[in-house]
């Protein structure tokens, strides 16, 4: 009799333990923003939901600016951004009675890519700037035979567009004939199909297109070593075009948003950063 009661008790405890472990957090979380961070946010959402099956997470891109606007308007819980939030966006948030909370969550290197057939071996930051501002229009000006340069970049809603303009172009305007595309994937695809093209994409996309585009080492200037965007070079910021990737919330996060960001910064969440192809923040 006692053995039967003990067995039933143990069974009940086992059920309670399994229920407690499987419960996790619940609710619906909306994440929106950076196209660069889209595969990363999807990876985090997938891994988080495995641990918290009662949580529903919606992840969409559209661009960093789109995500931050959605956060300000209250239509998303977390905005992903490949650039720091701008003062005017903080002011807009304050007008809605909150201050955005910033979370650096990963590190990225913006890879400069060309068609695999292009014989160019490397570029300086100045040369990249001159290409994208229109001072250099033909590959022959750089000593190689690849014809007319077709500059490809993102659209104005993109955080990468703005970061590249500020960090590489030093605030100068993009060349008028640049092909502006709505996604990083579209840039990589275009460069892979056009022998004269050059583009800029997040390192995770460069890795996924490894056999279709050629990643160029970049140097800080003439006479300085050209650095390939390896994980170590990006982490140490030796690679010239490195940056942090961010998540933003409406003030200090609570509930499901806090649980998600705690997961993002955990060893498991940072392992997801490496899995996707970016560089862990810690």
Task: Locate the predicted segments by residue.
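Exported/periplasmic ABC-transporter solute-binding proteins
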Residues: 18-282
